[in-house]
């Protein structure tokens, strides 16, 4: 594993628990299609606060989960050390998007504010519904409306009025009571 400067790495998933005794690990992908995580290579793992490159040896589906075999990780003990480690890729491997299109990983972590200025919470994940993507927004601890989570459709211009990735803010035309 080689060290990599941190400035251009974006998290695209996370290694999960071990699978079997030969070094396989479950994987959690934050790409829109789970297997799309394999389109972006090379991978970097965040180990002790630093990104280190790693080579993917193999992957496959197992019981509706994706499991991976990383080069040099050949037993359960070595794999256990990597459990819950973030997977990143260099931003340069992502294609440029058109105006109004965003990568999910850019939206996750953004603060959502409605037009009345009420902070509705933070985007924790994205959901695909078939008709449109949905922002899953974890409400603030002491939400005035008693909400723990909000599901807000990502309809650009209709609901989502502005996305500012510099300040990590999404402005929405959405009632805080929903």
UniProtKB/Swiss-Prot annotation:
Superkingdom is Bacteria
UniProt KW rRNA processing keyword: yes
**A Pfam family annotated for this UniProt entry:** RimM
Domain PRC barrel as annotated: residue spans: 99-178
Q: Name one GO biological process term.
A: rRNA processing
Q: Which family does it belong to?
A: Belongs to the RimM family.
Listed under subunit, the entry gives:
Binds ribosomal protein uS19.
Protein name per the record: Ribosome maturation factor RimM
- Native species: Haemophilus influenzae (strain 86-028NP)
Q: Could you read off the lineage of the organism from its UniProt record?
A: Bacteria, Pseudomonadati, Pseudomonadota, Gammaproteobacteria, Pasteurellales
